C-alpha cells in the first residue's frame, strides 16, 4: 500500500486578464514553502519525511478542483492543505472529499483579501459538514514576503503531524493474539470502533498459533540463533523472588529463554509478515505434519498490522512462559538487529491502551510505555512509610506506573541528547551508545510463579531521570462512544530511601516509573489524587514530551472527544467549526462537535 500523503491545493482568483496571472507565482510560492516546511519537520513512523504533493494546477474553479481531486485520488492523499494569498471562490474551490482531513491557510496581507477567502471557505466547510482547520497569521505580511511566520508554521506542522497519523492508521490492522484477559474491558476488541473511527481492520488470532509455529519451526532459524546469542550476552538474569522449593531449575529457565525469543520472532511475524518464511522448509518430525513443504507462504504474508496485543493471562501464562520479554522487546526501539521502529504490542491484549500507545508513537516517533496506573502516593503516605517527604516534581504526590515487565526499555531514561539531557529518542536517532546504556540499566527477573506458573522473564528497571511525559488513554463509554484522556507531567526520581521501600511493597521484579502529573488546581487536575480518581481504566500509555496539544488536534480529526486534559486553552487547535458549538466551555463544545460529525469512516 502506498504511503499516505498530504496534498497541497494552491487556490487562486479565477479571473483571467491580469488578476489570475498576477497571483500565480505568489500562490505557488505559498504551496512550495508549505511543502518544504512539512517535509523537513514531519516524519512517518519509519523515520522518512512525510511526503507532500502539490496539485498539478492552481485552482480557480470547479474544473481545476476536479483535476486536482483526480490526481490526489491516485496518490493516497489522506489530508489536504489549501493555500491562498487572495480572494477566491469558496465552495467552487474547496476540497469535497469526505475522507480527507482538511486545513486552509489564508495569507494575512493587505494587497489581496486572503482572510476573506479563508472565512468564506470555512463557512462553506461548516455548512457542508466537512470540518477544516483555519490557519491565519497574527501579523500582516508584505505580498513579497514568502516566509512562513512562526505562528503559522506551528499550526501547519501540528496539522500535518496529526494528519500523518490519521493516514498511517487507515487501512492497517489490529491483531489481537488471544481474547479478553482476566475480564479487562480494554481487551474486548470492538471491530466497529476500530473500523469507523480509525479505518483499522480488527484481526483475531488464537494463542495456539504461537504454539503451532514453535512446534513446526515456523520462524527464521538463522535469526533465532543470532537473537538467542544476543540475549545471552545482553540480557542478564535478575533476582528470583520465588521460594527456593518452587523455583524453576537452570534447565527449565534455559528452555524458557529459548521459548520467549522464538515467541518474539513469531508475534512480530504474525503481525508484519516475514519473507524469509517462504524459504523455511519443514525438516525431521516437522515434515511429517500436513502443510506446505516448500516454505510457509501464507505465514510469510503477515496480517498488515500497525499494532497488536497478547492476552497471556490466564489461559496461556498458567502453563507457558509469559509474554513480558516479547512485549518489552517489540515495544522498544532496538533488538538484536540494532535500532528499529518500535512495534506497538499491548499487554493483556488491551487494544485500547495499545491504541493510546500507538497515537503517542505516531506523533513523536518514539517508543511508548505500557503500565498499570497502579498506586497514588500522597506526600503524607510517603512520609508515614519512609520517614521523609518527596521533593521536586514529586512534592505534591505521584503515581506508581508499573506492570509485569512489558515496558519499553527506552523508559529507563538513560539516553542523552547533545546537551546531556535525559530523553526518549525518536527511534531513528537512537545510537549504539544509547542501546548499550538501556541494556545495562535493565535486568530480567524470573516471573513470580504464583501469578505466572509457566515462568518467563520480566524487564526490571527504574526510570532514572526527570523527563516530560504525557499519559494517555482511550476508553469506550456505552451511549457515548470513545473518549480520550490526557495527563501531562514528569517522571520523578526518588531517593533510594523512598524508592526502595515503595518499590518493595509491590512486585520489585517489574519496571517502575514514578509519574507526577502537572496540576492546574481545578477539576481532574486539582491534585494528584484527582488525576488518579478520574483515570478511566487500569492501564495507561505514557509517551515522551508534553504532547497533549497534538493529541487534542488528532482526536478532533478522528472525532473522539477529550474527556480530561491539562493543556492550556490557548494551545488547543481544532477544526474551525468547533467554535460554532461553543467558545466558552471548550470541553463541552468538543463533545457536541464530535457527536454532530460522527466517526470519520462511518
Question: Each predicted region: which residue ranges?
Answer:
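An N-terminal assembly and electron-transfer interface module characteristic of large anaerobic redox
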Residues: 1-602
